[in-house]
Structures are given as C-alpha cells and as structure tokens.
Amino acid sequence: MVDKNIYIIQGEINIVVGAIKRNARWSTHTPLDEERDPLLHSFGHLKEVLNSITELSEIEPNVFLRPFLEVIRSEDTTGPITGLALTSVNKFLSYALIDPTHEGTAEGMENMADAVTHARFVGTDPASDEVVLMKILQVLRTLLLTPVGAHLTNESVCEIMQSCFRICFEMRLSELLRKSAEHTLVDMVQLLFTRLPQFKEEPKNYVGTNMKKLKMRAGGMSDSSKWKKQKRSPRPPRHMTKVTPGSELPTPNGTTLSSNLTGGMPFIDVPTPISSASSEAASAVVSPSTDSGLEFSSQTTSKEDLTDLEQPGSPGYSTATEPGSSELGVPEQPDLQQEGTHVEKSQSASVESIPEVLEECTSPADHSDSASVHDMDYVNPRGVRFTQSSQKEGTALVPYGLPCIRELFRFLISLTNPHDRHNSEVMIHMGLHLLTVALESAPVAQCQTLLGLIKDEMCRHLFQLLSIERLNLYAASLRVCFLLFESMREHLKFQMEMYIKKLMEIITVENPKMPYEMKEMALEAIVQLWRIPSFVTELYINYDCDYYCSNLFEELTKLLSKNAFPVSGQLYTTHLLSLDALLTVIDSTEAHCQAKVLNSLTQQEKKETARPSCEIVDGTREASNTERTASDGKAVGMASDIPGLHLPGGGRLPPEHGKSGCSDLEEAVDSGADKKFARKPPRFSCLLPDPRELIEIKNKKKLLITGTEQFNQKPKKGIQFLQEKGLLTIPMDNTEVAQWLRENPRLDKKMIGEFVSDRKNIDLLESFVSTFSFQGLRLDEALRLYLEAFRLPGEAPVIQRLLEAFTERWMNCNGSPFANSDACFSLAYAVIMLNTDQHNHNVRKQNAPMTLEEFRKNLKGVNGGKDFEQDILEDMYHAIKNEEIVMPEEQTGLVRENYVWNVLLHRGATPEGIFLRVPTASYDLDLFTMTWGPTIAALSYVFDKSLEETIIQKAISGFRKCAMISAHYGLSDVFDNLIISLCKFTALSSESIENLPSVFGSNPKAHIAAKTVFHLAHRHGDILREGWKNIMEAMLQLFRAQLLPKAMIEVEDFVDPNGKISLQREETPSNRGESTVLSFVSWLTLSGPEQSSVRGPSTENQEAKRVALECIKQCDPEKMITESKFLQLESLQELMKALVSVTPDEETYDEEDAAFCLEMLLRIVLENRDRVGCVWQTVRDHLYHLCVQAQDFCFLVERAVVGLLRLAIRLLRREEISAQVLLSLRILLLMKPSVLSRVSHQVAYGLHELLKTNAANIHSGDDWATLFTLLECIGSGVKPPAALQATARADAPDAGAQSDSELPSYHQNDVSLDRGYTSDSEVYTDHGRPGKIHRSATDADVVNSGWLVVGKDDVDNSKPGPSRPGPSPLINQYSLTVGLDLGPHDTKSLLKCVESLSFIVRDAAHITPDNFELCVKTLRIFVEASLNGGCKSQEKRGKSHKYDSKGNRFKKKSKEGSMLRRPRTSSQHASRGGQSDDDEDEGVPASYHTVSLQVSQDLLDLMHTLHTRAASIYSSWAEEQRHLETGGQKIEADSRTLWAHCWCPLLQGIACLCCDARRQVRMQALTYLQRALLVHDLQKLDALEWESCFNKVLFPLLTKLLENISPADVGGMEETRMRASTLLSKVFLQHLSPLLSLSTFAALWLTILDFMDKYMHAGSSDLLSEAIPESLKNMLLVMDTAEIFHSADARGGGPSALWEITWERIDCFLPHLRDELFKQTVIQDPMPMEPQGQKPLASAHLTSAAGDTRTPGHPPPPEIPSELGACDFEKPESPRAASSSSPGSPVASSPSRLSPTPDGPPPLAQPPLILQPLASPLQVGVPPMTLPIILNPALIEATSPVPLLATPRPTDPIPTSEVN
C-alpha cells in the first residue's frame, strides 16, 4: 500500500508547477522549454522518484525538499510562486513528513534553513510581498519549533533569528508583519531557552574558535541611505516590480534583480568577516523621520502580572532543581573529540575573576553556504547518533547548542544598551521583551557563559534604563530586573545593592519632572521583591550584616514607613504599596510562627535528627520552594543548591555530603576547581550565623563607619579610634591595616594615598602593595589595578616611593622580564606620563598627544641600555590611549560610571561578593524587632486616615499579625505599643461621657478597633504589660457610659436582700427637697446637658447606643476577668497594678470609678485563688490604703470593706494563705472608729458569713483574737485597740505615697510599747503564768514581706508578757462590766454579731481552750452593749459628733459635667451604705426593743451553754493533748483554771444582765445565775474560789442592784433585789464549810452584813425590810448551830471575837434581832435548830417581796490608795482614773486590823458607806486577823473576776427549782 504522504507531496508539486506554468512567461510555452527550465525539470524528476516508491522513508528528505527549496531560492520566481513553495514546505514540516530519525534529516534541515533565510523573489506590490515575508516567518517558526528543528546547526539558528529580527526592526514594513515577526521571535526564544538545561557548557577554546560565525549585529538592520535612493519604477504595471524593503534597485535594462532578505547587505549569507567598525558604519537607525511613514510602536507587551512567572511552559525550573539534573542526558559529542578539541570541565563559578565577555576569535573559519549538507552524522535530541555509511569529505553538521543561545543572549543584551545610538526605542523594548521571555523560560544562572553576560552588560544596561523617562521601557526593565534578582541574586550581590539604591532614589527624589507613575512602579518593584520568600532576610544578612555594604533593609524599612504617611493627608497608591511592603515581613513572619505553633513535637524531633548541624542554604529559585519550612524556621536545603556547590562538570555532591557541619561543606567546595575561598562569607563563623553573631557584626559595622569617617578626615585619628574599639590591634599590624585599606570602599582614596605614601609608614606601604596579585599581568595592566586603589599624590618624591614599591612587587610576581628594577621603574613612570599626556585636558590644549613613535623614542635604551620589546610598548600604548587609567573620584560622567561599575565587578569577584541564601523563617525575630515600630506606626496612620473597608481590614489584619508574632516571641513592649495604638481608635478615651454611647455607636471603625483590642487582650494577655492601663481606661469609660454588661456592674453584697447591688446608681428623682429645687432651676435655665436629658434621647442616639451595647457584648470584656487565671504571673501583676492605679491618691478622684476598679481587682484575685499568694501583697496593700486612709465614710470604703471580707470568705479554705488573710482582717481594726461604725452592717453580715463557712479553718488563737475583736468593735462599738489606732494614725500622712514594698513594718520591740490600757482578756489571766512570745509565726512572716504587723497582743492581749515596765494607774477589778468604753453601736450589727457568736458557741467543735476566753470576753462586751436595751449606746450615738467631710483626704472630682454624669443617687447607697445618724436615731424606737430583748436572751442562753460545757471542753482538749503529746502551751482542766478562765467571767456576764433595766431580762438572768451557781461542776471549787465568787460576782451584783436601774419598774426592782439577796445567803450557807477555812472569813461575813443593812433600807416597800431579817436569822442560826461563833480558845466554848463583831454590825440596823434570836446570854446553848439550818433558810427564800425601796444616790467614792492594787492589777484598759467607776459603788479602805467599837452610829447616818462600822470602836480589843488587802472587795468596781468552784453538799435537800 502506497504511503499517503507521497500523495501529499505529489499534490503540492502539482500546485507549484501549475503556478509556475501559469506565470506570464509560460503563456506560449513548448515542451522543449519545460525540459530546459531547471525548476520544472527538478519537479519532473521528483515525480518519477515518487512514483517508484511506496514508502516516503525510502528516500532522503533532501530529495523531495530540493525542488521546492530551489523555487524559494530562485530569483526569477514571483512572490506568489515563492509563497506557494513556502506553504508546501511548511506543510511538510507541520505534517511531520520529515522523519527526525532519518539519517539525512539534518542535511535537509540545514538546506531548508539556508534556502528560506536566503529566499529571493520578484516583487509585485508591497502587500503581496509582505504576504511572502509572512510565510517566510511562518516556515522559520515551524522549522525551529518542530522536533526536526533540533538538527539545525548553531549557524542556521542564528541566521533564522537574524532574519526574524530584520523583519521586526524594518520600519518600512507594516506593523502587522513586524508584530508577527515579534511573536515569532518570542516563540523561538522561549523554545531555545527552554532547551537550555539540555545543553552542556562548551570549553572556552571551542567557543572562541566558533564564535566568529555566529555574530549577530545589533543596530539598524538596513542602511537608511539606501532607502533614500530607492525610487518607484516607471515601467508598465505588468513588468513593474514593487521593491520590497531592502530589495535591490531595478537595473536600467529592465531585468529584475533578486530581492534578498539581507537588504542588499552581506549580512548572513556572505561568509567574509565584517569588522565591527564597518558594520556599524553600514547600519543606521531607522527613525520615524524616514519616508517609511510608519510610527514607532510604543505599546509595551510586558504587562503580565509578575506573579505568573511559574508557568507550565517553563520546565527549566522544575528540572533544574532535581539532584543530578544539571545535565539532562546530552552526552559529550564524539565529533568534537574527532576535531581534536578537548572537552574540559566548566568552572563552577566565575566569581573570582571579573566576568569578561569572551573575545571574538580572529581566526578565519570560512563556512560556505553550499557546503555539502549530505555528509554528516545526525544526533537526535536524545543524543542517539546516526552515522551515514558513505560519509564524504567535509565536516559533520553539529546540532545547535549553547553557542547560539549565548550569541542570541548577547545580541538581546546589546539591543538594550541605551547609549548605543543605533538602538531605537522599539529595539530596546524588543530586547527587553525577549530577555523577559528568556529569563521566564530557563534557569539562566546555571549557565556560566550567560551568567558572565548578566553580571556585566545586562545589569548595566538595565540600570541605565531606569533613568529613562519612557515609562514602557522603564516598566519593562523593572520586570527583567525582578526576574534576575528573583532567580539569581546569589550571583549579583552588588548589582542588587545598586538596583535597590536606584529604586530608593527614584522613590525619594523630589524632582517635579519625575512622573508619579515611576515612583509607583519603583515601589511596586520593591514590594514584589519583598514578597519573595526569604528575600528580606537575605537583604538583612548580606547587606545590613556586611561591614562594607549599605544597611539596605534598615534604610528600606525607614523609607517605606516614611512613605506610608501621606503628607497631604490623602492616601494614594504609593502609600498603600509602602504599607504592603512593610506588611510582607509581618505576613511571612506570622505564617512561620503559625507553622511553628501547629507543628507537632514529634515532627520537630524527626527533623532534628535529619537536619545537618550547620544548616544548608536553599539556593534554588524561591518561587519553586513556596511551601513553608520546618517549624523551627530552618529548611534543609539540597547541597546542590548552595552557591558554589555546583562542582566542576555540572556534577553535584552526593546527598549525604554537607551534613556534618560547616567545615565539611567548605571542604567540599574547596575540593572543586576554585580553591580561592569557601562559599561562606568570611565574616560569618557558619553558613547560618546565630543572631548574637549578627548583632556583634552590626555593632562592629557602626564602629567601622565611624572609624572610616574619622580616617577620611585624618587617617591617624581613624586608625587610633579603631584600635581603641578593638577592631585593629595595638600596636598597629601593617598587614591588618593594609587589608582594611583595600577592603573598605568607603575610604577616601586621596587619604589612602597620603597615608600609605607617608615616609613614616614605609612598612605599611610594603604590606599594602603585597595585597595586590600581579601574576600574569602586563606592567600597564598591573599599574592600572594599583593606581585605582588610591589617588596618586602630586609630589615627585611621594610618587617615586609608591612606584618603587609597585615595581618591586610586580617583579616579584612576574620574575624579571626587564634588565633591572630601574628599567621596570622607568617603564612604569613612562606609562603614567603617557596616561596624563593622552587624557589630561590641560596637557592636550598645549601639546598634541604623544604618538606611538614618540613613546618608543622616549624609552629608547632604558632597559639596561637596550630597548624594550616593541610589541609590548605598542600594546601598552594602545591600551592607555584607548582606555584611560582612571584616577579615582576625579572623573565624572560615563568615565566615572565605567570606573564605578568596574569596581563593583571587582568586589563581586572577591569573597566579599558571596551572597548567602537563607532558608525561610531564619532570623524572623531580628527582622521583626527592626520593623515592628515603623509598621505599627504606618498601620495606625493608614487605619486612621482610610475610609475604605478593605484598607481598614488590611490594617487590622496587620495589627493582629503583629500581635501574634509578639506573643510568639514574648515581646511585651511590641504588644503594649500595639494595644496603646489601637486604644486610641476606639474613641473611648477622648469622648465625653454624655456623647460616648452615640459617638461610639455610630463609628464602625471604633467598633473594629474595640473588638480587636479586646480580642487581642483575651488571646495574648500573657504578654500585656503597660497596655493594661489603656484597656482599663477603656473599660472605665464604658462603665461611666453605662455600656458594660450587667454582670460586670453587679457586685456581691452582704446586706442587700438579693445578695447583689449595682455599682451604677440608677437615675432616680432626687430624694431631698433642696435637690429637687436645684434640678428645677437647672431645667428652667435650660443648661445644655440637662436640656437634652429632659427632652430624652433621639432615635438616632438610641439606635447608636443599641449598636454600641451590641458591640461591647461581642467584645466580651468580662472574659478579661474570668480568664485572668490563665495569665502569666507578670502580666497578672501588671493588670492588678493598672486597677490599683485608679485609687484616691491624688487630690481628686472619682468614687464610682475607683469602686468599679476595686471590684474588678477583687474578682481577679478570686479567679486566681490557686496562686493568690503571689498577688496577695498588692491587693492587701490596696485595701489597707482604702480603708485605713479614709477620713470619712464613703461608698468606696464600704466596697473595700466588703471586698476584704469577700476575699477572706473565699480564701480561708486555702491553707497556704489563710493565716495572711486572717491577719489582713486587722485592717478593719485600723480604720477610724467613726468610719468603721458606718460600715458595721456590712462587716457584721460579712463576718457572719465568714464564720458560717470557714470557722473550721480558723485554728490559731491569734486569728480568733482578730475575729472576736472585730465582732466586739462592730457589735458593741468598742474602739479598736489603741495601739493599732496609733500606728494607723502615724502612717496616715504618708501611706498614700508608699509603694508596695514601703509599707511600714514594725519590729518586735515596737509592739511592746506601753499602750496605756489593759486589754480585756488580761483581766482573766493568771498573773503568775510565764510570759509568751507576743506574735505568731504568721506575724513574723508578714514582717518580712513589708506589711504592717499587728501582734495578737495589740488586738487582744490575752496572754501578756511579764516584761511590761512601769507602773500603771489602777482600775477596779471587781466589777461586773468589762470596763471598756463602748461607743455607739448599730442594733442590727449587734444582732448579727450575736448570731455569729451563737453559731460558734452552739457548735462544740469551734470552741477550744484557745478561743474560749476570747469568746467569753466578747459575750460580756455584748452583754454590756445590750444592757438596758442598748440605751448607753443610744445616748452616746446621740452625743457623738458628726464627722466633717471637709477634712476628708479623698475628695471627689469636681469636674465639669460630673453632676450630669451622676444625676443618679442611689437610695441603697445612701441609706444602707451611709447609715446616717439621723436615720439610725429615727429607726431605733420602732423595732429596737424586740430585737434587743432577743439579743439579751440569746446572750444569756449562750453564756449558760458555755458555762455548762466549759469543763468538758477543757478536759477533752487536755486529754487529747496528753494523748498526742503535742508541744505548745499545756492545757489545764483543773477547777482553778476553769474558774479563772471560764466560770467566773461567765457568771459575771450573767450577773451583769441581772442589772438590766428590763424586768424580763433581769428575772431571766437571775434564774440563769442561780442555776449556774448551783451547777454540779462548781461544787469542786475550794474556799478561795468561792470567796472570789462573792467578791467578783455576787457583791458587785448586789452593789449594782442598789442603784435605781429601772425607775419606772419599782416593784420589779424590789423583787430583783430580794431574789439577789436571797441568792447571796443561799450560796453563803451552801458553801459555809469551805468558807470557814478562809483567814478572811470575818471580812466576808461583815461585807454580807453590810449588804443586808443596805438592802433593808433600799426599798420603799416592806418587801425587803421583812425578807432581809428573815434571811439574816437563817444565816445566824445556821452559823450558830455550826458553832462558828464559839471561840476555840475559850474554855467551855465562850463567844468568839466574830460573835462580837457580828452583833456590833447587826445592831446598827437590827438592834432587836439579837434579843429575838438569842434570849439566853450563854452562847454555848444555841437555839434548838436543825444543825444545817435549812428550813429557816428555805422559809427565808419563800418570803414574798413587795414594796418599793429606793436607794438614794451615793456621792462619788474616794480614789483607791495606790498601794492597794499595784501588785495585783495589770495596766488599766484606758487612761481614765479609777474614780470613773459607776456611781454608787462603795469603796473601802483596808485597815490593818479590826477594832470593834461598843456603840455604833445611828442606823441611817451613812447608809452607803458600809465600811464605816468596821472602823467603829466595836472592833477595839478584837484580836488582829490576818486579812489580805482585799478586806472588803465587794466595794471595789473591777473587771477581772476570780474563779469560784465548789462541790455541792450531798446533804443539801433543796432542789434548784426552789430558787426560781
């Protein structure tokens, strides 16, 4: 079956042949002509061949292509026919009729390329001719882009490209055709550069020998002069040949010559070499002024988004990054070896030498167009070779490779040179466009030959283009620059520095001519660069951290920040672009932080094991490495990607290489061909230096810059400075200094010259010269290098010194090519003179420049008498003539530019030029530290000024990311700054309170700011420090404006029935008349704010407030408190400080604000109760300040007190803090009594709550002392212990100024100062007990923490030490009252305190020997306070002066609008918080009496309970102590202890209530007393204790009852007195036996008789006067029966002295009793009575009491003699004298002996002074009795009962009930 392709070819033959025949020439043709015509003949031959085969592959491609190619080459064919032949060829290529694997394919391709690029045809008209040209383009494109195109040679490819360029740049052609050519070129360039990774680098010698043929010339593609000569032919239309552009002119004879694409110039098809000079002369720029009539195409084609670089059409990127893929399978070509060329390994990096463009080789290598293309080997794209068997002479055709690409690249670069006059704008633009395509398509940097071009010419041209104001060229060059620095910045360190500096210059320049668009594009370019991963980090590492580079990153950051702030206030694109650039750093850093947070620990561990110890840097294109790196911010780069790790021959290190550390990596690099330096910058210790090292380098750099500046002024000074700073050694090391002089580009070359040429520095000059390497350099080249390092001074001796050093060095490096050193010196000098002669303008003006001959002549015979080699002199002459040795900093313009550029290239070739590529996320912290300030400032500005939603969101996103980063790295200062900035935008700080809801509610930006602030504080509160103040200020504003949620303004309260009160007072009508009047007046005057409040808020305002409330709800401010438990301690402490700072420290303050902050503080403390120990000090100091410093009651004080108690209630359960918490309750005792009394309600209720919930957690006596003292002060108005008050007052003036650590601390000895009072419990104390330490361990701890120490003894000195010095005034120890001065008290508070006591007492677990006495004392104080229904308190309350608030330290703000802010008064705050005196007085009568009655009854019950339980409590504790053998003070449970500490005080308390004015209370108390005295436990008491019972309980009771306690209830009082006297006699008789053993029995008995006397005359009724004698009879009879009156000494039992004294006393008031009872005179025979005398006693009890006896008032008694109690009593409770005892208390003096008197005074002469009879003459003759000083203790009012105990007599038949 015949191949279909054969038919296709036959069809094309027919079309072309038909066209030829139809042409005019064939109109009258004959077969003979057809035979003779070579074109038709070849077609006929081809037909025969095709007919003889069945498969097309049987013939070579050349066979069927040749006829068509001949038509294309033929000069005689017309355009249409040529076009048909081109179409056919294109079809063959498109249909793949040419087999790429066929051995003749290469030859065929070469022929085709040659024919099409040299196509000739007879022109018809311009339009038709352009069609042919279009088809030529089409064929060329298809040819290169189809697979068979790979067989084309380098020369063919160059010719193809050249043809396309010619059409592209021919301005006479239509724009459509030129654009088509441009698109064709784009496709071709893309293909060639896409294939770049497949080509191998050619050895330099091969490149040199072959380059000549491939020169493509830049510049104009046609000679413009020829255009002008072309004329239209005047021939008739049939013969007229429209000349195609570049066609030759018609000859006069009418024959048409060929139209050649070369434009009539030997451009491609002429093999003779063209010198550069002639080619330049032959090509002129085609400008718009030519008669082509065409305009420039100013349209730019490079507007694609630069982010789309990674297109699938650029496989070079992905393949190049795979290990081992640097050479993709093209093997070394054998034909090159056959030619004798040696394939060398290409060098890994040509950074050591200046990258020079390879020179053109001048060796002629003719290459004929018609070379035999049949004889060649074919190598297909995969490298498979097809060798023809019959190979003929001639060279083999080599497929194209790197040479043509390099030549194309060089040509494209030359097109971009703006200083080349031949390059039009169109050409420059085209060059840029194609370079863009090339860079987008291939990893050009991997090709060293191309890299050299990029480093030098390409970068230079691009930077020059940045100064051109043609925006399309400017934009295109920016685009190319981006591609360069994105992909190969590691090779272009100093180029990039220059580029960025140029961009910065464009952005900052204030030139009005500079278009805004240029600035915008420059900024856009920077932003694009900054978005490249790691780019910013690399800027920082390679420039900021390089001693001799600019601080690019720092300067750019400053520039961008400054540029983000609009001067006019209006935001433009440039401002937003600047912000974008700054945010790129933030964005990338934040993304890395997120990645670190998200990565699990296991992944980190895996990476740690796999990561090399010295990180390897990723040097591939960053765009292909977009995925984020490892969580620790370091990436594992491939060894192949490190600059310099491309080993010779394109090989790579094996993967395991480079993992053992920096040294291995460097060794691997050193093992390559270039061993001059490692690929690590010498300033770093490792490829990834740590941040500390970078900081050191930065600091060193600053010093170096300073040193450089000083050197440039005065070299010695600069060197000295650097030596002082340790950067240069002392003494000066010449080598080190010389190296510095060479390295530092900032040094003034003139100063270097002066310094090294100084004759003092001869050694330095040697070292300096030795830094140059002159090997292999001609003398003038070496001298050029030498003289560019410094400026040659003008003095001859100095020049001589410098040149001598130079020549010596040069000869050392190059041997001795000259006769001697003088010859060398002379030649060097001659070169300098020649340079001056040729290039110095002044010299040129005077003389003509020196010629070569003159130069030679001058040096004749200088070389040791001989001449120098003439060739060398000629070379030197031309080198100097053509290129001046530039004296640094002397030249300007292009010369200077060239010099600067050469210096840049030189620096790039040294180790200084190493550019370090770093992994993403390295040094994020360093960068963020440098950028956060400018970025936050810029964000704030943009946020403030912008109205666009997107920009606002971008700014907020920036804020959030900054916050996240600062949180990640723990940068508090950054986060604080951020919060403070954001708080300004919430509109909460600036607005007045009245407007705040409406302003805030209607400001969406403020909403966003507020939500952001709160969100960030919730999320990253851990690192917030100073910012808390701003947040709290915002919270306060919300509070003032009533925008906070209800939960935040409702706080716990003890008194309120709901348990909560609101901190915000509701707006209620004022509750006082005058206030109403004021409101009315203000309404009348229509003062602004009031007016609006009267009218009511508008709808808009209401809506705004609703929105504001909704926004605040979303902010969730309460979360700040509830989640404070998760804050780090430091942040928590700062938060608390911020809250504490809103304190009445200043002269003015706002009470509600302070209360709100206090409540937040307390809630935070409670939230943090798990670690409350850390913050307790702060909150305690704050509460101390609020409570103790308050001079008058206010709401804030009340909240502080409630807060303290709330804390105590919640925190007491925590063992570690409970002691400190209880100690802190003493703050309440330090308060001013007047203030404390005003908060008594709250304290009473709070203490009740505390005891109910936490009594079990209170263990130590000290703590109980605090609580009981508090209960006493609150419940009964007792003034707090004076020592505390004294210390509090002493602190008052300066306490406000104290910091946390400065609170007054008191030392041990301070506490034991002489207080001038006796604490209540001291009275109960056994004075013989050894002293104890006055302070608990807790106190000692607190001293250390700087807190005011209050020892237990100061609060309640229950256990006094013996060390108190000095005498003290006496107080009456024998009184029923506790002897305290009770202030006014609040009834409800007392009731609550009694409830609290009741709770403690009724739960047996809470009462222990530690707190028993305290409890009893408190009960007694309450008894005294509730006595007579608290009348004493009411009297005092009425008299107590009202405290004047003028002296109040805390003054409220009298700020404008404060009245408006609080038109609200709170009924609850006023009535319950303030409890004014008026309220209290009015409120008392209504409910007080029932309440007080209840109180008294409760107290009685409690005392009785304690009395009955005392023995069991003490004994059980004593037993437990013995069992556990615990240390500490021993608990005694004997009767003496119990009496002294328990029973006696309790009996005194009950007895006290027996003296109540209320009958019900008195009677109940008497009943309780009777029960108590007869209780079983008391029977164990001995005589002394019973005596004490009389002295301390019964006698004081009887004395008190003599007073007119209840004038209204006369009968009741009579009954009370009768019951009391009966109780006296009953107790006396019951315990008569033990009492008889007392030595003081007589005194006791006489005192009883005194009371009998008084009581008989006390009432007005007969009740007592009848009952008393009966009782007395009973007692006398019992005593007589017991033979008490019988003298033991007298024989026969005569009457004793007691008998005499008794009757002396009785006779005073009952003179006839003796006769009634003892009618017989003999005492021995007593009256017949029962021995115990019970019955009369009983009858005495049953006597009814009636009548009203009133006791007259007693005059004040005399003072007790000081010796009476000095040894017995402790210091008095208060500084009052003993004479302040209650009136009516008789006082007795104590005579040393009793002297009876025979006659007594009249019965009622002095009834109150009972002691009068004792001193009567009755006592004369009575033997002296050993009485102690307490002869008549009942007459002394005292506060300290003495215990009494006794065992009941079993014979006593009287049940207790009888007493009732």
UniProtKB/Swiss-Prot annotation:
The residue ranges flagged as biased composition, category Low complexity, are 1285-1297, 1775-1792
Q: Where is the composition biased (Basic and acidic residues)?
A: 620-631, 1433-1447
**Which stretches does the entry tag as region Interaction with RAB1B?**
1-381
Superkingdom, natural source: Eukaryota
Result for mutant: residue 795 to D: Inhibits Golgi membrane recruitment of GGA1, GGA2 and GGA3; generates misprocessing of PSAP
Which residue positions does Phosphothreonine occur at?
508, 1338
- Could you tell me which residues carry Phosphotyrosine? 1317
Provide the alphabetized UniProt keywords: Charcot-Marie-Tooth disease, Cytoplasm, Disease variant, Golgi apparatus, Guanine-nucleotide releasing factor, Host-virus interaction, Lipid droplet, Lipid-binding, Membrane, Neurodegeneration, Neuropathy, Phosphoprotein, Protein transport, Transport
SEC7 domain location is 693-883
Among SMART domains, the record links this protein to: Sec7
What processes in GO biological process is this protein linked to? cell activation involved in immune response; cellular response to virus; cilium assembly; COPI coating of Golgi vesicle; endoplasmic reticulum to Golgi vesicle-mediated transport; endoplasmic reticulum-Golgi intermediate compartment organization; establishment of monopolar cell polarity; Golgi disassembly
| UniProt-listed SUPFAM superfamilies | ARM repeat (SSF48371), Sec7 domain (SSF48425)
* Skewed-composition ranges (Polar residues): 250-262, 290-301, 335-351, 1298-1311, 1465-1474
Tell me if Protease is a UniProt keyword of this record. Answer: no
Could you tell me which residues belong to the region Phosphatidylinositol-phosphate binding?
887-1371
Phosphoserine modifications at = 350, 353, 663, 1299, 1319, 1321, 1336, 1476, 1774, 1785
User: Which segments show compositional bias classed as Basic residues?
Assistant: 227-241
What topology does the record note for this protein and the membrane?
Peripheral membrane protein
Assembly and interaction partners:
Can form homodimers and probably homotetramers. Interacts with COPG1; the interaction is independent of ARF1 activation. Interacts with ARF1, ARF3, ARF4 and ARF5. Interacts with RAB1B (GTP-bound form); required for GBF1 membrane association. Interacts with GGA1, GGA2 and GGA3. Interacts with USO1. Interacts (via SEC7 domain) with PNPLA2 (via C-terminus); the interaction is direct. Interacts with ARMH3. (Microbial infection) Interacts with poliovirus protein 3A.
Illness: Charcot-Marie-Tooth disease, axonal, type 2GG: An axonal form of Charcot-Marie-Tooth disease, a disorder of the peripheral nervous system, characterized by progressive weakness and atrophy, initially of the peroneal muscles and later of the distal muscles of the arms. Charcot-Marie-Tooth disease is classified in two main groups on the basis of electrophysiologic properties and histopathology: primary peripheral demyelinating neuropathies (designated CMT1 when they are dominantly inherited) and primary peripheral axonal neuropathies (CMT2).
Q: What name does this protein carry?
A: Golgi-specific brefeldin A-resistance guanine nucleotide exchange factor 1
**Organism annotation:** Homo sapiens
